[in-house]
């Protein structure tokens, strides 16, 4: 589907030929326009046939004086970005099912459409029209081919429009890989997706296999992978949009391409959804796809530890002790708490980049779903400035998160008699204790953890990946462009003396 930004005031839009004209109507709509469209909106509001509330719709066909075949008036209340998204989603869900090929979305009734409004409208159109088709033998063609965003001032709307197009590409790239079945998105294939991104400007990719990972001493990551015949991959992406002296932001995405739980096996019900356990990795890939479009002046590193978690004959067992890349030993009390085991080695690896900040993204805990549901992602951080920046980015991008506690008392449950740390505590506060485990490996840099277990995908009839938190991550990164600073010497990471990893893996 193609998008176009066009100067179309209300008076001019009446002569715009299209299959459907979607006009967003705010609650403070100015009266007095003498064009047919303004007259139609005023009459509908006065008669009570239309309410200027988000999601309220009124359709009219072959309206005199209007060239569009169909006119849809959609209320947007106070015209906030959130309300615009709600209105466009409602209207486009209806329009995409007909023979509509060209839609004009008019923001002209809202006076000057700010960039955030334009972005919300474009992203909502994309979400409504998205259809996964990669593994289907027969696909009904999407009839909707073009969406024109009509505004009063191009100069005001252009920044939001350009950003929205990049964001749409990032979200759809993330959705594509998250939605693929596990046998179509193995660690090797995921590495191929990263290599695909390396064709784009300023992106470089390096892929490490089992031998390289073993040489690095990533015993925790290797332990998770030893139960599967699919070889692990450690994917390193670099977006280099600034000078080498500029310290990068590091994004780490959990890449468990299928999670059975291992020996601590999950129940069979809805286990198919465990293909979504790599949504953190998919969000990193999607963010890099968007960065390639926008070319911001900053440096970003993406790290993806990719593996399956399977109950094979060599699989990790409850009670095993493994040695992480940091040298810390970990007792495995539950093999279904594998995400933190791959992330902890990635956090240690991130130290070599002397990062400005590190953000890990993971479908980590069911406890976070219980706490926050599917509305907000869980945010944990050891740095207030970083946490505030991420939270603000979540609000502005309509991809919200909620900061959770990281009190030291939560780490008490991770104590064990047999290693430096256990990989799980009790059930209480499970999202927090998981974050406290990761916190141990992030002591030398500003760090944040986004638990997206409740927001990365939807179940039921609308089952599929959401593409979150690509919008949040992109907004955060773009906000860091002016804050870019040369690398500073980082304090040496405190770690125990490294010993040979307990767990081994196939080459």
Swiss-Prot record:
Cofactor note text: Binds 2 manganese ions per subunit.
Main EC class the enzyme belongs to: hydrolase
PROSITE patterns given in the database record: CYTOSOL_AP (PS00631)
Pfam family, one: Peptidase_M17
Record's keyword terms, sorted: Aminopeptidase, Cytoplasm, Hydrolase, Manganese, Metal-binding, Protease
GO aspect biological process, one term: proteolysis
Binding site for Mn(2+) 2: 254, 259, 277, 338
Enzyme Commission number: 3.4.11.1, 3.4.11.10
Cofactor(s) the protein needs: Mn(2+)
Catalytic residues as annotated in Swiss-Prot or TrEMBL: 266, 340
Catalysed reactions, as listed in the record: Release of an N-terminal amino acid, Xaa-|-Yaa-, in which Xaa is preferably Leu, but may be other amino acids including Pro although not Arg or Lys, and Yaa may be Pro. Amino acid amides and methyl esters are also readily hydrolyzed, but rates on arylamides are exceedingly low; Release of an N-terminal amino acid, preferentially leucine, but not glutamic or aspartic acids
Compartment annotation: Cytoplasm
Keyword Protease: yes
Cited CDD domains: Peptidase_M17 (cd00433)
Binding site for Mn(2+) 1: 259, 336, 338
Alphabetized SUPFAM superfamilies for the sequence: Macro domain-like, Zn-dependent exopeptidases
PANTHER family: CYTOSOL AMINOPEPTIDASE, LEUCINE AMINOPEPTIDASE-RELATED
Family: Belongs to the peptidase M17 family.
This protein's name: Probable cytosol aminopeptidase
Encoding gene, per UniProt annotation: pepA
